């Protein structure tokens, strides 16, 4: 968006006056006034330089918001690391931010710079409803995400089985329906022009009941729910950490490291990646042909019994805490009275070892998933905190005005600043994902630089 073009369009619109038949309907501000003289636009509240500067800043904000959130959508839909069902919430949230940038912010900017509403009565109602809808949907999305985080922490196994893409999509539809119900009143309660105003205006219902109900439904009630849910998540996480520290004991007599609650011990690092479990399989067990060769040697009289037994130990010796496993292997491989190795015993030990390895692998995967859930919960907590910081000043001052009117009214420039800070929140989520989440950062680099390299090759 080039700021000179936008400024020129605004100047042309101001010279033309309100469009269509709505101009006369909106009072003396449209077409010709009551005395029959030509319509004169209101005196500009900003200089030409200020108009160009504001248009440039907001234009950059719009472009940055659209590009950043489009990257989020592409990353979630194309990256294997981000294809978890719960990330569909982020796609829907990014879509709401894109709609704010394309359907709300340009008209808010024009209304601010021109000092009157140029776009007609019908679009005024639609614009106000969309404004409230997208803001409300953002916070209701965050509320649904906080509940998703809570259930994934407190009911990890059961909830993860239930959290399918279909269920997540149904929840997203419910979020948009709830937001639409909350934002519907502006369609029927917006006001056209305050008494005594010379120019058409577009604003929300100024009655106290609407101001307070919209602030509570669109902001304060969801914020309260999010705060309570995340406080509960923090308590559960703190309790689990305390329980885990109590379960950890000193190293055992065989030097075994303390184990975690899922028996993995130190296999999982802080980055959520599991160290591969030690595979206690001897070199002679790696080949079925080798096992058959040894059994044949044992049948011929056990002449190589001692050598076979010498091969049963691993190259590095038994790992900590695996003495019982090694004992079972040695006993199973010791030939019976007739110099024969029990085939049933060998198979049972092999089955036991394979089951142990599968259990360790399953525990490792679960540990990695839990670490990823923990990082995701932290990132979303940052997103929610930033959202509240951006929108709280506006909703607090707006509700304060609804209670005590002029006695509590803020200076108009400060109120408008709070209003635009709320809009800025739509551009911040991609930045938060980039800073705090390695999967998003890697995916953004892959999307941007891979396509750029393709362009250079062409």
Curated annotation (Swiss-Prot):
Q: Which residues lie on this side of the membrane: Extracellular?
A: 1-51, 115-124, 192-207, 404-416
Basic residues: which segments have biased composition?
Answer: 291-303
Give the top-rank taxon of the lineage listed in the UniProt record for this protein. Eukaryota
Q: Which SMART domains match?
A: 7TM_GPCR_Srsx
- Residue numbers for the site described as Implicated in ligand binding? 131
- Locations listed in the record: Cell membrane
Which cellular components does GO assign to this protein?
Answer: axon terminus; cytoplasm; glutamatergic synapse; neuronal cell body; postsynaptic density membrane
What keywords appear on the UniProt entry?
Cell membrane, Disulfide bond, G-protein coupled receptor, Glycoprotein, Membrane, Receptor, Transducer, Transmembrane, Transmembrane helix
Listed GO MF terms: alpha-2A adrenergic receptor binding; alpha2-adrenergic receptor activity; epinephrine binding; G protein-coupled receptor activity; protein heterodimerization activity; protein homodimerization activity
Q: Where is this site: Implicated in catechol agonist binding and receptor activation?
A: 214, 218
Q: What membrane topology is given?
A: Multi-pass membrane protein
Give the function comment from the record: Alpha-2 adrenergic receptors mediate the catecholamine-induced inhibition of adenylate cyclase through the action of G proteins.
Quote the protein name from its UniProt record: Alpha-2C adrenergic receptor
Its source organism is: Mus musculus
